[in-house]
Amino acid sequence: MFGFRLSVLLFAVCSLSACSCMFVNSCKYPPSQWCDSRDIAAQCGVLEQCMKFNASPVTVSLYYESLCPGCREFLVSQLVPTFIMLSDIMNIELVPYGNAQEKDDQGNYTFICQHGEDECRGNMIETCLLKALGPKAIPVIFCMESGADVLKAAQPCLGVYFPDTTWDSVMKCVTGDEGNKLMHQNALKTNALKPPHEYVPWITINGEHTDDLQDKATNSLFNLVCSLYKGEKPAACGQGLKKRTNSYCMN
C-alpha cells in the first residue's frame, strides 16, 4: 500500500511539468525514501506532496458514559459512522467514565456512576473490551450502544464480531483487579481534562476541547474531521454526514 501511494505521488509530481520531472530524475534517493525527511523531500522536489502524504490523522477522543442518552446518540449517529468513512485520516479514543465518582480503599477502587450500577457495569465491560481488542472493539461497542439494552447486548455483540473471544475472558477483566485498575486509569484521564469536563459527551480534538469544537463535532463530526485534516482529502470528504446531537448528561 505504501509503495502504491508513493507511485501515485511520483506520477503526480511528474505530471505537474517537465521541469518537475527533471528535478525528480536528478534526485539521489529512491522513491521509497522521498518522504523520510523534510530535507530529502525538498531535494527531490516533493516537499509539498510529502507534507500532505505524512499528515497526521485527526484524533477524536470521546469521554462518555455507557448509559448516557446523549453519549449513546453521538457515538452511534456521529462518531462511528464518521470513523467508518474517514478511518484513513482519523483516530478514535474512547474513555468510558464520564461523571462517575471514584473512591480509593487502599488501592481498591469503587465507583459511583451517574446512571447507577448498570452504567458502572457497562463502563467496565467497554473498558475491558478496549483493553482486549484495542480499536477493533469499536464495532462491538457500537453494537452495544445501538441496542435497546446496552448490557444485554454486550455478549451477543461480542459473539457477532469476535466469536473466538470468550465472554468469560471479558468478565474476568470486568470483575477482577485488571478492570478495577483500568477504570481507575479512565478516572485519572477524565479528571485531568483541561478545561475540566462539565458534561458528557465531552469531546476533544487532537487533545483540545473548546466550545466551538464541541459544537462543530456534535453538529457534524464528519465535516469537522475533513476540515481539520492537513493532508490530501479523501474522496469521502466530498460527501456529507450531518445529524446534530444536543443531548448532554451534566456533571
UniProtKB/Swiss-Prot annotation:
GO biological process: antigen processing and presentation
Organism superkingdom: Eukaryota
Gene Ontology CC: one annotated term: extracellular region
Primary subcellular site in the record, as a coarse category: secreted
InterPro entries documented for this protein: Interferon-induced_GILT (IPR004911), SAP_A (IPR003119)
Leader peptide range in chain numbering: 1-21
Induction: Strongly up-regulated in spleen and kidney in response to bacterial lipopolysaccharide (LPS).
PANTHER family per record: GAMMA-INTERFERON INDUCIBLE LYSOSOMAL THIOL REDUCTASE GILT, GAMMA-INTERFERON-INDUCIBLE LYSOSOMAL THIOL REDUCTASE
Similarity comment: Belongs to the GILT family.
Binding partners and assembly: Dimer; disulfide-linked.
Primary role: Lysosomal thiol reductase that can reduce protein disulfide bonds. May facilitate the complete unfolding of proteins destined for lysosomal degradation. Plays an important role in antigen processing.
Protein name: Gamma-interferon-inducible lysosomal thiol reductase
Native species: Carassius auratus (Goldfish)
Name of the gene: ifi30
